[in-house]
């Protein structure tokens, strides 16, 4: 009896330290430039919201740190079982934060919801129906062959939702009450102040190593860096290049960089849309004329902006596709500044004496976005395009301009898509009727529709190369550069920046 008790005591002494070590501990603070517009991740198309959502929700598949697609809530990668049918086997034993089981009904509910008129719905348009085969198998029927199905399922907007908890609930309710299967649960969201998350002890992969994660919006670059230096935050995004050396030489913080999937561009309004994303007709402003758009493109010296504003921490692009994207064409070269050609195009468009223009830009969202917009404004003014710059806090920029099709005539935006495919660059921004579109070109739409259904990669790549050339000729946007993502982080963290801009506390640990 004594021996048995002694053995039990030894076992207890051995087990307790292991459990204590494994339990989530500590707190970190992550400073983003802006607060999310919503925590209903199916109803957003912005990275700050996706970063927070990646802690609360899981998707069927995801990209690992090397951007390779791997199973997540799916037990294995989806299989094409017919030309327009994808089968997905699901992981068992997973629960939502409220205790609801994750199963085939969850997938059916989530995919049907995300394609039904939400901000990201254009990415899920090919889904025709979702069939529940058994509790842990679904078959997704598509209206046409869909080669990017698996990569779209890694989209943060394809997050899985609990059908019982969310039945009949609107997006405002879900934004206030996010319930996922993710590694963290929401504790509170004090709008424009902080989002507090706590580790989910029942997470299917095992509990996170860090107990509490706080997101704080700090729009000002210098304030964000100062907070990092002072130890008020542990990770800071969008480090301005001119402050990178300070971080690199600081004894308690370090710089982590990654080539970004994001490009920055000037977008043009060429057509008008109503609030339901229906085409109204040609835009009545100056940017409806292709020659004006081309003149603006030739008036800008992007190389000088990259050198002078971004300290060389960016890469010129010929389109909105980076070398990381399927559809990228290395043979295409960026437009060089040509003031004579810009003036020639303006004269041909009926503006021999120049013209007046408004440029809208966010402030605090992208690396030195306001300064980039100011540099563009100065260059356009020198070229005879009298430009007035208006800057906005990012949430207002999206809600009051971009999401209601009133962003123009010219507006600065960044775009990064984790699918790494031209489909989710060109589709959401330029396809007729897309949620963010202010452009219409039936030839472009037809080629994009064709590319979206080609299962042969060579044919699909060739089609995107043709689309790239059409896009450059019609100039619905001026591609500026591929961003190089710069992060500052505390040396008490084990962490490395990713190229898809996600910051995952689950992958972090405290030293």
Question: Where are the predicted features?
Answer:
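Bacterial N-terminal signal peptides
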Residues: 8-18
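Extracytoplasmic/periplasmic ligand-capture domains
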Residues: 23, 63-65, 91-121, 129-130, ...
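N-terminal lobe/hinge region of extracytoplasmic solute-binding protein
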Residues: 31-81, 112, 179
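Short, well-ordered beta-strand segments
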Residues: 28-32, 236, 358-360, 481
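Surface-exposed binding/hinge segments that line
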Residues: 82, 89, 122-166
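N-terminal secretory signal peptides that target proteins for export/translocation
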Residues: 1-4
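Long beta-strand-rich cores associated with HINT superfamily self-processing modules
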Residues: 345, 487-511
């Amino acid at each position: 009896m004594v021996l048995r008790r002694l053995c039990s005591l030894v076992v207890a002494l051995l087990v307790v330290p292991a459990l204590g070590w494994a339990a989530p501990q500590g707190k970190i603070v992550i400073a983003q430039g802006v607060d999310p517009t919503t925590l209903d991740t199916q109803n957003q198309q912005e990275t700050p919201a996706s970063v927070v959502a990646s802690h609360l929700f899981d998707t069927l598949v995801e990209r690992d740190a090397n951007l390779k697609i791997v199973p997540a809530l799916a037990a294995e990668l989806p299989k094409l079982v017919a030309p327009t049918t994808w089968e997905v086997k699901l992981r068992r034993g997973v629960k939502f934060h409220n205790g609801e089981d994750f199963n085939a009904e969850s997938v059916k509910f989530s995919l049907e919801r995300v394609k039904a008129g939400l901000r990201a719905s254009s990415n899920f348009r090919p889904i025709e129906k979702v069939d529940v085969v058994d509790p842990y198998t679904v078959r997704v029927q598509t209206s046409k062959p869909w080669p990017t199905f698996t990569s779209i399922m890694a989209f943060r907007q394809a997050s899985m939702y609990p059908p019982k908890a969310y039945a009949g609930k609107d997006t405002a309710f879900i934004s206030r009450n996010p319930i996922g299967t993710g590694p963290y649960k929401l504790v509170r969201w004090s709008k424009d102040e902080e989002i507090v998350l706590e580790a989910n002890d029942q997470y299917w992969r095992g509990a996170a190593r860090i107990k509490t994660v706080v997101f704080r919006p700090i729009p000002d670059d210098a304030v964000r860096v100062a907070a990092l230096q002072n130890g008020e935050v542990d990770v800071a995004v969008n480090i301005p290049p001119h402050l990178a050396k300070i971080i690199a030489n600081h004894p308690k913080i370090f710089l982590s960089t990654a080539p970004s999937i994001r490009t920055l561009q000037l977008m043009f309004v060429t057509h008008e849309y109503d609030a339901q994303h229906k085409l109204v007709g040609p835009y009545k402003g100056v940017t409806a004329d292709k020659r004006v758009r081309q003149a603006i493109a030739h008036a800008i010296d992007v190389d000088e902006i990259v050198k002078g504003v971004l300290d060389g921490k960016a890469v010129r692009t010929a389109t909105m596709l980076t070398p990381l994207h399927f559809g990228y064409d290395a043979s295409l070269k960026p437009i060089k500044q040509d003031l004579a050609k810009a003036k020639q195009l303006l004269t041909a468009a009926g503006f021999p004496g120049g013209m007046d223009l408004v440029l809208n830009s966010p402030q605090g969202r992208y690396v030195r976005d306001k300064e980039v917009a100011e540099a563009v404004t100065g260059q356009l003014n020198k070229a005879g395009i009298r430009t007035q710059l208006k800057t906005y806090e990012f949430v207002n920029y999206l809600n009051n301009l971009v999401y209601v099709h009133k962003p123009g005539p010219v507006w600065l935006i960044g775009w990064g898509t984790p699918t790494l495919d031209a489909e989710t660059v060109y589709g959401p921004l330029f396809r007729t009727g897309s949620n963010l579109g202010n452009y219409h070109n039936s030839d472009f739409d037809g080629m994009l529709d064709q590319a979206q259904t080609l299962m042969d990669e060579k044919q699909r790549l060739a089609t995107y190369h043709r689309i790239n050339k059409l896009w450059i000729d019609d100039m619905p946007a001026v591609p500026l550069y591929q961003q190089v993502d710069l992060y500052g982080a505390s040396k008490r963290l084990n962490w490395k920046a990713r190229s898809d801009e996600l910051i995952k506390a689950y992958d972090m640990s405290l030293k």
